[in-house]
Amino acid sequence: MSAIAPGMIFLAYLCGSISSAILVCRIAGLPDPRVSGSGNPGATNVLRIGGKRAAVAVLVFDVLKGMLPVWGAYMLGVTPFWLGLIAIAACVGHIWPVFFHFKGGKGVATAFGAIAPIGWDLTGVMAGTWLLSVLLSGYSSLGAIVSALIAPFYVWWFKPQFTFPVSMLSCLILLRHHDNIQRLWRRQETKIWTKLKKKKAPK
């Protein structure tokens, strides 16, 4: 069934290119996340400018647009190598969306969704790693960075045949977080709790 894989890659890219952060903000009458807050059209920035409900909607949609193309290809019998490329295509679409002038998010939620069809055990470990990192540090970006660094080792342990494509995904996520890494190093990164407090503060 790898004959259909190139078409699935293209479809995954198109799915990834649907920027839920921009669409949710438009529907909810919120500022454009590309020019507000951190300027990143992702769930964390929507949390900053729009609150929890909008952020959850963005998060769920971003996970699904990574999960559904990979899960569909998996059910059609596509081989692990091509599944990895389909997952990468969904994340590339999220990061450089053709529908929104190639200005997208950082791909964390979409990458998580793309990895999820590999197995729920892996999904649980990955989610736990991100959550623990955020709870201990207060930085959403650090949770993403730590998860991206550890993900290839988790995959090697649970499903070694997917190690290479997941490693490629991790590299992509880390590259997209280079600004966050610099801010963390300089201790200039904003903690997620601070974002929530600013949102709740009276105007």
Curated annotation (Swiss-Prot):
* UniProt GO cellular component terms: plasma membrane
Give the residue spans that cross the bilayer. 4-24, 56-76, 80-100, 112-132, 138-158
Q: Where primarily located?
A: membrane
Compartments (UniProt record): Cell inner membrane
Q: Say if the entry is tagged with keyword Ribonucleoprotein.
A: no
Q: Which UniProt keywords apply?
A: Cell inner membrane, Cell membrane, Lipid biosynthesis, Lipid metabolism, Membrane, Phospholipid biosynthesis, Phospholipid metabolism, Transferase, Transmembrane, Transmembrane helix
User: Its catalytic activity?
Assistant: an acyl phosphate + sn-glycerol 3-phosphate = a 1-acyl-sn-glycero-3-phosphate + phosphate
GO molecular function terms here?
acyl-phosphate glycerol-3-phosphate acyltransferase activity
Q: Under which pathway is this protein filed?
A: Lipid metabolism; phospholipid metabolism
Asked whether the UniProt record includes Coiled coil among its keywords, one would answer: no
Q: What does the record give as EC number?
A: 2.3.1.275
Q: Which domain of life is it from?
A: Bacteria
Q: How does it sit in the membrane?
A: Multi-pass membrane protein
One GO biological process term:
phospholipid biosynthetic process
Q: Which major enzyme category is it?
A: transferase
Q: How does it assemble?
A: Probably interacts with PlsX.
Q: What does this protein do?
A: Catalyzes the transfer of an acyl group from acyl-phosphate (acyl-PO(4)) to glycerol-3-phosphate (G3P) to form lysophosphatidic acid (LPA). This enzyme utilizes acyl-phosphate as fatty acyl donor, but not acyl-CoA or acyl-ACP.
The UniProt similarity line reads: Belongs to the PlsY family.
Name of the protein described by the UniProt record: Glycerol-3-phosphate acyltransferase
Organism of derivation: Enterobacter sp. (strain 638)
Gene giving rise to this polypeptide: plsY
